[in-house]
């Protein structure tokens, strides 16, 4: 059970970091970078949904 919790915690941190980078990329008009990050964003979001994490407050981008 502890391993599952560690994986979820890591995924949450990754999700937050990815969103920060996406926001920065969008501000800098780095759309190619934004699209690559968006792929990671979608994958991590799907993983967190499967893990049952409520993303309503964590998801800033909401795409």
Question: What name fits each language-model region?
Answer:
Residues 7-10, 17-63:
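Short, charge-rich amphipathic interface segments used for partner binding and complex assembly
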